[in-house]
Amino acid sequence: HLAFEWDISEAVADGENAFAITVDNFRDRDGCPQEQFNWKNYGGIYRPFRLEYRPDIFIRDYLVFPRRENGKWFTDLEVTLSRKADCTLSVEMVSGDERQTAEIRFDGTDTATARLTFDSPAVWSPGDGLLSEVTLKLVCNAAVVDEAHDQFGFRTVETLGRDLLINGEKFQIRGASFHEQHPTFGNSVPGWQWTSDLKLLKHCGLNAVRAAHYPYSREFYAACDREGIVCFAELPCWQFDNYHFESPGVLEHCTGMAGKMIRQLGNHPSIIGWCIQNESATFEPKATGFFKSLHDVYKQNDPTRLTLSAESPEPPEHLAVVKKVSATPSGEAPLTSGFVDVFGVNNYAGWYGDKASYLPQLLDHVAGKITDKPIIVSEFGAEASAGVRSLTLPHYSEDYQSELLCRQIREILKRDFIAGFFIWLFFDYECSSISISGVNAKGIVDSHRNPKLAFNMIKNLLNP
């Protein structure tokens, strides 16, 4: 799910060259995601690729971390070169009408930092995707050997008690989860389609996306940046159990992936946090060290964003049948609640076993156990087969889905101690189980992005 590269210099000959790339999507129990997961994973290379000529010394990575202290904005820039060198890097940042420059000297090193201060930059905020620009030029032996140009955003994110703050102001998440999938494009969703999806999301009155359950293409996050949509990017630790917690190879794989996510996606202001896991067996004692290690990778390498854990405090019956995960001892809080910044509750009351009234009871119970951080409902929902309507509200009807979602949203909005929600999910997608004919139909629009009844009812609820 993340970008990768090969150095093919030794295979290139003078004249015309032909290259063939062989890939597979082999599933590995020690992988991330693990061997079993409930979404369709297409084979082949389904994201953009390019052939690139690089000099001996080039800009390997760069991250722009915006901060605000005492009313003053500044950026901390971190740059990594391909190897240690004696070079100079010129930096130019433009934000609104303001332009700042700096020069970084590499004296036999491959990493360097710089801080640039701004008086009144263009500030990125939810609903207002104001972006700034950074240009880097690497000069070695009086010659420009490499250049890089990117966009970033001035914004801050933090927590204050149970509140989530963006740019110092309280922000309530009203969102839905996505999967990286479209019936026409498969996993190769183009940027213009993502932009269309996000505009439809905003039309419904929603302001955030949980990009479940793996890193998406950069085109998706760039679209979120432009549209002012808040996003949580996610590490594919999906329903991990003691096997994964006890395997050093799994932890090494996941921590490496977390580091790559930061380096590849860290300049997107729409990403306000990293989700470290979904519905894993977090009550197992060995889970604490495993997920604390992942949390630490994110916080040590990116202190400007939050971490989220999406839990099943009371496991839905379907998960208990499929796999023994998150077996919650009565009255206990998941062990990840001790260190993550935001605690997520996944619960499908009204769909899998429990009555609809169970979700608000669960939220009140969780809030009594976790009092020092934001709590969000990270998943809730019901399936609806598009076009199925009935006054008797049977399962799989648009009417039942709409009634249940609106009821649960009202209960969430009544509770000031809940920092927001992510509906599961925005559009239907192909999956391997728990589905109608291989489709998870919990979307409030169908896979072709045609709205169901729930879309319009939620729109009316959130925009009275």
Residue locations for each model-derived region?
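Accessory beta-strand-rich segments of carbohydrate-active enzymes
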Residues: 1-59, 84, 229-232
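Short strand-edge motifs at loop-to-beta-strand transitions and within beta-strands
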Residues: 2-6, 110-116
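Active-site mouth of glycoside hydrolases
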Residues: 4-8, 29-42, 157-354, 360-361, ...
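Short glycine/proline/serine/threonine-rich loop/turn segments at secondary-structure transition edges
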Residues: 12-16, 118-131
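Conserved, mostly hydrophobic/aromatic
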Residues: 49, 132, 168, 224, ...
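Beta-strand-rich binding/interaction modules
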Residues: 73-106, 114
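Substrate-binding cleft of secreted/luminal carbohydrate-active enzymes
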Residues: 398-434
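Aromatic-rich peripheral "rim/lid" segments of glycoside hydrolase catalytic domains that contact
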Residues: 424-464
